[in-house]
Amino acid sequence: MEVQAKLKFARISAQKCRLVADQIRGLPVEQAINLLTFSNKKAAVLIKGVLNSAVANAEHNDGMDVDSLVVSTIFVDEGPTMKRFEARAKGRGNRILKRTSHITVKVAEKK
């Protein structure tokens, strides 16, 4: 049985977040949390929070054993993009795209 947790509208691009997500896919939860703790990326902090939430959901709602959990599925989808204006020289302007993403983590017990 899979238990999931989601973080929606995270202020990080999906491309940057997927770099970290790909590292922990399929790992045992304890090893994944250890890897995320010592990563220097902003996405690692966000994903670690979602992973901890998924583990808490599994333990509280379904009574699963935390030590036997594995990151079965993790994916990052693009959220809406906020468009901002940046003034440039000679009356011009550039558009800045502030990207967001939706992070979904699913954990399951080892088979």
Swiss-Prot record:
Molecular functions (GO terms): rRNA binding; structural constituent of ribosome
GO cellular component, one term: cytosolic large ribosomal subunit
Keyword check for Cell division: no
Keyword DNA damage assigned: no
A biological-process GO annotation: translation
InterPro entries hit by this protein: Ribosomal_uL22 (IPR001063), Ribosomal_uL22_bac/chlpt-type (IPR005727), Ribosomal_uL22_bac/org-type (IPR047867), Ribosomal_uL22_CS (IPR018260), Ribosomal_uL22_sf (IPR036394)
Record-stated family: Belongs to the universal ribosomal protein uL22 family.
Name by which UniProt lists this protein: Large ribosomal subunit protein uL22
